[in-house]
Curated annotation (Swiss-Prot):
PROSITE patterns associated with the record: CULLIN_2 (PS50069)
Protein name: Anaphase-promoting complex subunit 2
Source species, domain of life: Eukaryota
GO molecular function: ubiquitin protein ligase binding
Gene Ontology biological-process entries: cell division; metaphase/anaphase transition of mitotic cell cycle; proteasome-mediated ubiquitin-dependent protein catabolic process; protein K11-linked ubiquitination
Gene from which the chain derives: apc2
Length: 681
């Protein structure tokens, strides 16, 4: 600022004389006009010359303007006519200051100054390099000059930055315990006195303002991390409690849900995400948002994109059913055991519901109140139809029951009982029959073994053919001793069940083998096909793969899978020219073999797999097309099959069924899919 003092703009004595002449009987309006003219012609011109570069120049400006007002005030107080109108004249003076002062420049300098003040205040509350008393005097002069709004606006802005930085540094990743009350006490202690001076408020009013500021910042901080908070549930219950306490305003709740949906869409709801992972994420979302907002308004908004995404996933049904039978954090069996208090289709809008409450004000038009906190019910309601879920449930149950080796099906039975609360008895009748088959099989097996008609090691599961899903059956030549035992078992069954016949499914089941070699003994649980294959080496020391296929009466491709299994377990060794022999000692050199994925394939076929298997009759036509025409797209293959396969057994499949079949051929390494087209491998 220039060295020119405001009192010398016209001379202090001259100014007093002019005002004195005005005050003697002159009306108030005339005095105000004189003040405006004097301010405009004299003070304003010098204000335009002020160069506000630092806080010192700001102090000088406020000091001199304050002195200038004291001159006016003295003249007004000396006049009995004007003294009652002091407030009115002060308002006029303040308006002139706001109009002609460079407010934007003042705000810039003041912001920098306030930043220094808050830093020093946090460090030690006192600092010889920064005169806090001088800062408080500056605050008083800002209020006197009508610039308190500028001071408060800038102070709030800087205070928000500092409080936000402090809360972020200390609490950004502290999610296990709620930090809301601790943060309130901390910020009150740090800034309470300073805010009281700046705003001239009593202590209770200051605390209310600081609490509101902390709530706003903490709500924004937790909302920005809402996706990670949900992902870390239940280790983030403290952060959820913070959100429950601070995210109460409509704008805060809207920002919370919008941030969650945006982050969820970009990070979770992607094509590369596994459906099981998304389902478990949805469960965490339900838990978090119900704790945050029990009425369910926020959950309704946050869950819509997740539910829509899962509804479009073809494998979501299968993944959900699989998770219902898995324990621990990676499954939902614990949720399945939580029996809902009401049927999931019931409504809360009943006339006899004396606890009815209106929807929250920020609820969407299609908002429906949750009838309970049944997570499984919420997952089931994702899908428009329950029929695909029931079919997948039947497939999974059949697969699990077929894997049993001791008739103990209590876990599966309990799961089905829990599901009956949600689907009803009638819908799950097929599952009940499958469970009943296992129980009946146990009684029949005990009865047959009680009379020592068959080997103690042979146990059979008897299935009611019409009530089980389609099974993947492959017939092969059984070893003589095993066939004899099975025939004896079937005869005993026929005697007990009035001539009813058993049809064995030879590739289904398991066999416990003990293989004795020269330097070791192996105990393995294998499939009947693998057991039949290795039994071929009891009669010969070496065997050609073609001969093995002939003896088993199976395709070479299937026999190769059995062979890989025994090579992997170092029971057989390759001696060249597709010939193999038993590996009697570990010391023998052999090629390491990686077991392929076929060992984990289920014996139960889904509808898509059954359809693909039935389409093998068209494989020769597909081979002919790809041989003569090269790589072809799905649509062209479909059109050519429709055109060239004549009735009455014409091609009537859909493109979706053809796609499943071609995918199966790719899995069997007969086709390749590149550039959107299929070609022979």
């Amino acid at each position: 600022m220039n060295d020119t003092d405001l009192s010398t703009f016209t001379g202090r004595s001259l100014l007093i004389d002019q005002l004195s002449s005005v005050t003697q009987g002159t009306p108030v309006l005339d005095f105000i006009d004189k003040l405006r003219i004097h301010f405009y012609t004299t003070i304003r011109q010098n204000l335009l010359k002020i160069d506000l570069k630092n806080i010192c120049s700001l102090h000088d400006l406020t000091d001199q303007l304050s002195d200038f007002w004291l001159v006016y005030e003295q003249s007004v107080l000396e006049s009995p006519i004007l003294s009652p109108e002091l407030d009115r004249i002060l308002t006029c003076f303040r308006c002139l200051c706001r109009r002609y002062l460079p407010i934007s420049v003042i705000e810039s300098v003041l912001t920098e100054y306030l930043d220094q003040v808050l830093k020093v205040w946090l460090e030690s509350k006192t600092n010889p390099c920064l005169d806090m008393e001088k800062f408080f005097q500056l605050c008083e002069k800002f209020k006197q000059l009508g610039l308190s709004s500028v001071l408060k606006e800038r102070f709030v802005y800087v205070l928000q930055l500092h409080v936000g930085s402090l809360l972020t540094t200390r609490y950004a990743m502290s999610w296990e315990q709620s930090v809301y009350h601790e943060a309130l006490e901390w910020i009150r202690t740090e800034f309470g006195v300073l805010v009281e001076h700046v705003f001239s408020l009593s202590n209770p009013a200051v605390l209310v303002q600081l609490d509101h500021l902390v709530s706003q910042i903490l709500a924004h901080l937790r909302s920005d991390n809402i996706l990670d908070i949900v992902l870390h549930y239940p280790n983030s219950l403290g952060a959820i409690e913070d959100l429950r306490l601070v995210a109460r305003q409509k704008q805060q709740r809207q920002y919370l849900t919008e941030t969650f949906v945006k982050d969820c869409t970009s990070s979770i709801l992607t094509a590369s995400s596994d459906s099981s992972y998304i389902l478990l994420f949805y469960v965490s979302t339900i838990r978090c948002f119900v704790a945050l907002d029990p009425p369910g308004v926020l959950l309704d908004k946050a869950a819509k994109p997740i539910r829509s995404f899962l509804n479009e996933r073809e494998d979501a049904y299968k993944c959900l059913v699989s998770l219902l039978f898995v324990d621990g954090e990676k499954g939902l069996r614990s949720e399945l055991s939580q029996i809902p208090t009401e049927n999931i289709d019931s409504t809360t809008d009943r006339f006899d519901n004396y606890h009815w409450m209106p929807d929250p004000i920020d609820a969407a038009p299609d908002f429906k109140k949750p009838t309970d906190r049944d997570v499984v019910g919420s997952l089931i309601s994702i899908f428009k139809s329950k029929e695909p879920l029931v079919k997948e449930l039947q497939l999974l149950l059949a697969d699990r029951l077929l894997q049993l080796t001791d008739y103990h099906y209590e876990v599966e039975a309990k799961n089905i009982e829990f599901l009956k609360y949600r689907f009803g008895e009638t819908v799950l009748q097929m599952c009940s029959v499958m469970l009943n088959d296992i129980e009946n099989s146990r009684f029949i097996d005990q009865s047959i073994h009680m009379e020592n008609y068959v080997s103690k090691g042979l146990h059979v599961t008897i299935l009611s053919r019409l009530f089980w899903p389609t099974l993947s059956v492959r017939y092969f030549h059984l070893p003589g001793p095993l066939k004899k035992e099975l025939d004896a078992y079937a005869e005993e069954y026929r005697e007990r069940k009035r001539k009813r016949e058993l049809v064995f499914l030879p590739n289904l089941g398991s066999v416990e083998l003990e293989i004795e070699l020269e330097d070791r003994t192996l105990t393995l649980t294998v499939t009947p096909e693998q057991a039949a294959f290795i039994s071929l080496f009891e009669e010969t020391s070496t065997l050609h793969i073609e001969k093995a296929a002939e003896l088993l009466d199976q395709p070479k491709e299937i026999v190769e899978r059995h062979l890989k299994f025994w090579l992997h377990h170092r029971v057989l060794t390759d001696i060249g020219d597709d010939r193999y022999r038993v590996r009697e000692t570990e010391a023998e050199t052999a090629t390491e073999t990686v077991l392929d994925e076929i060992q984990g394939v289920s014996a139960v076929q889904s509808e898509a797999e059954s359809s693909a298997a039935e389409m093998r009759v068209y494989w020769s036509f597909v081979v002919g097309m790809l041989t003569n025409l090269g790589a072809l797209e799905l649509e062209r293959i479909h059109n050519m099959l429709t055109m060239f396969i004549p009735p009455p057994n014409g091609y009537t499949r859909t493109q979706s069924e053809l796609r499943e079949f071609l995918a199966l051929m790719i899995k069997e390494e007969k086709l390749e899919f590149t550039g959107g087209a299929y070609k022979l491998k």
